[in-house]
Amino acid sequence: NIELIFGISPGFVSESIDQTTLNNKIQAIFDLGIKSLCILFDDISFEATKQKGKEHAEILNKVSQDFPEIKLYIVPQIYSDQLSKTDVKDCLYLNELFSRIKYKVPFFWTGENVVSKSYDLEYISKIQERFNQELIIWDNFFASDYCEPRVTIDVYNPFVKNPKNICGVMINPTGKVNLDILLLELFSFGMGKGNEDFKSILKKHLPNEMIDILHYFKFEGRIGDVDKDIEIIDKVLWNSSMEIKIELYPYLHFLRFVLKNKPDLKYLLDKRLRLKS
């Protein structure tokens, strides 16, 4: 079953949020037949204060009241431990927000970091209990919008055991069709629902030569034998005819340029692309 959730970002441009304008937009998508909506308060530049928590709760309550047929979700302005200046359970914004929400509104959470590799399910459960709303993990493991042209192709195994006590897990993919099909299979395998193992999935979707340079695609990548890796990258670029190659072009060309020219890009490689020599 597929549930289409439409996202709206009120407050992204202006600190004040016009409820009438917001409701008009919601009515427009509701008229199109969309019955699930997520209010996105993430990435707002204004400080996440206690007052902002109150305002965001009032907006959610008004939307829930005016559109009872719509299933409502929220990405709070603080959506990760990393973004909170205090322990999350003591965060003034979050406590004010969730204490004032009068309806059941599941919220998205990215874990300890905005881009998390794994999750402490016991801790996640405590956050869920603290705020008395269902929690959905927003997983950025495979995401690339913040580090283009970097591509992550790695084993997805963020849970020690099946996360039964949370509402769900949503992965944030890349928007590249063939690559996302591969990543969805890796996600399914990591959740214990796939029939193929990691290597079988890779062989089905990637040129054979790619397997030998996967260290550049790991979540925590590394630089290998530069001369040998340049040769392999050239083979993938010029000899492979698989459709997914087009979606990997930007990263492969970037790697080829950096490895061949060896500029002083330590900050870019380490901090931006997570590649350590």
Could you say what each language-model-derived stretch is?
Residues N1-I70:
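Substrate-binding cleft of carbohydrate-active enzyme catalytic domains
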Residues L4, S9-S16, K25, L179-L183, ...:
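Contiguous hydrophobic segments
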Residues Q27, D31, F107, Y156, ...:
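Generic preference for hydrophobic/aromatic residues in regular secondary structure cores
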Residues I44-S188:
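Catalytic-core regions of glycoside hydrolase
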Residues M191-S277:
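C-terminal functional modules
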